[in-house]
Amino acid sequence: MLKGKTVVLGVTGSIAAYKIANLASMLVKKHADVHVIMTENATNFINPITFETLTGNKCLVDTFDRNFQFNVEHVALAKRADVFMVAPASANIIGKIAGGIADDMLSTTIMPAKCPKIIAPAMNTGMIENPIVQDNIKKLESYGYEIVESATGYLACGDTGKGKLPDAEVLQDYILKAIAKEKDMAGVRLLVTAGPTREAIDPVRYITNHSTGKMGYAIARQAMLRGADVTLVTGKVEIEPPIFVNVVDITSAQDMYEAVMDRSTEQDVIIKAAAVADYRPAEVAEHKIKKADGDMSIKLSRTKDILLALGNQRIEKGIQDQIICGFSMETRDLIENSRKKIDSKHIDLIAANNLKVAGAGFGVDTNVLTLITRDSISELPMMSKEECADMLLDRIMEMRKAADLS
């Protein structure tokens, strides 16, 4: 994903410096060329040899290192960088950069860098809330630096509050958003649904399905990385939503219907990847239903068909600049059933999979999709859900271009 990209990580004096070793390792696994610059104080928390071992590159600390290459080292690295992240960023380095002070290897390297620059503050709550530090952060934002929001939690000083460095996975996502993909979806407003719905029987029990939300979340993440303005309408799942995505949490099919329809006319692309219940209990018991001898039956009522409502709305309101994609899970007659859905629901595309095919369906990290339109069929091999998401988004962008919507 990051092959051919140069990532520069600036590490300052903070107990959170250990997290950057994990971040560097993660980036190397994605084939990035990772270079680490440390302040003198940072070396008291983690040894430069750690970063050299993980990245295969010299860790820079001393501006006047006699073992420099012919190029002025800090300028050469600044020119090569595709993205520059300072994490953890102390109040000191934030103040230096904001004030134009360049007196060590880190500050002299970030100063001439033209690439996207990301600052991840990490410090005591009292320090990060200090008006001077806040003014410096705002100043950097005004200069185009992206600021990573500090996490809240237990701090090394014993306090609990804001100032904690986010985990390496979050920091990595900031880097990926900056450089991992071409921003071919910039300006595209995309809504995707994900996960299951829950239809209450009583205060304790509900009807649901096996959806984990992985496919919908993969679509949301890949679209975000490609620059789209993403809204994720999601049922209850066990995975964290991607950063930089507008998340709308729902529980029932009716909740999802309302959340989607309320936002639908504002979207350029709608992808309905959620596994929405087709039926719900006609009545919800006020109290827990007690166990009794014999069988029990529950009367079910049909839920609203969100995909059909979207297709009908597009016709009724004359919306001509919107692509609607549905997901279909079949066990037989996959293409025939999918084409019927395209026609009956007035949509553009179905991403279909067969639950009986190995590597497809719920609870796995792969999928086997067939992308079906009125006049084309594209069968994809088994691949990761992230790769499936990209292939689906590629197809949608092709359709937008063909319709002169891009």
Model-based region annotation:
Residues 1-118, 124-213, 217-406:
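A cross-family phosphate/adenosyl-ligand binding-site feature
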